[in-house]
Each structure stands twice: as C-alpha cells, then as structure tokens.
C-alpha cells in the first residue's frame, strides 16, 4: 500500500471511532440530564410533602410518565426470581 492509502484508511478509522465515542458520550449525557430532572422532581415532592403533609399529584404523575416508580424500595425485597 502507498503511504497515502494508509493515511486515508487511518483517517477513516479515526472518524468511525470518534463517531462511536461521541455517540456514547451523548447517550450518557442524556441519562445524566434525565436523572437530574427526576432528582429535582423528587426533591420538590419531598419539600411539598413536608410543607403540606401530602404529596402533589401533578409531580407524581410526571415521575410516572418518566417511568420512575414511587414507594419503598428495600434492597432486600427481591420479586424478580
């Protein structure tokens, strides 16, 4: 192979690796943003529950829409056997 062909092949491989790495970074960043949003909603729920004595239905429904289950999550409760 000519040196120019090797350089082009290396450039193509580097571009493919960069695309894969940045795709993974974007996916992880979205997960972090989603988790922050969930954490903020849970904090608001806790704050409102302390203030009023009950929980806000609107925020619970927002958490349910995102797929977050509310309730007691004990690590020793294993129901997936």
Swiss-Prot record:
InterPro entries according to UniProt: Vpu (IPR008187), Vpu_cyt_dom_sf (IPR009032)
Regulation of its activity: Ion channel activity is inhibited by hexamethylene amiloride in vitro.
Keywords: AIDS, Apoptosis, Host membrane, Host-virus interaction, Inhibition of host innate immune response by virus, Inhibition of host tetherin by virus, Ion channel, Ion transport, Membrane, Phosphoprotein, Transmembrane, Transmembrane helix, Transport, Viral immunoevasion
Localization in the cell: Host membrane
Effect of residue 9 to V: In strain: Clone pNL4-3
Residue numbers bearing the Phosphoserine modification: 52, 56
Any one biological process term the GO annotation gives: receptor catabolic process
Extracellular side, ranges: 1-6
GO CC terms: host cell membrane; membrane
The protein, known as: Protein Vpu
Organism: Human immunodeficiency virus type 1 group M subtype B (isolate BRU/LAI) (HIV-1)
Organism lineage string: Viruses, Riboviria, Pararnavirae, Artverviricota, Revtraviricetes
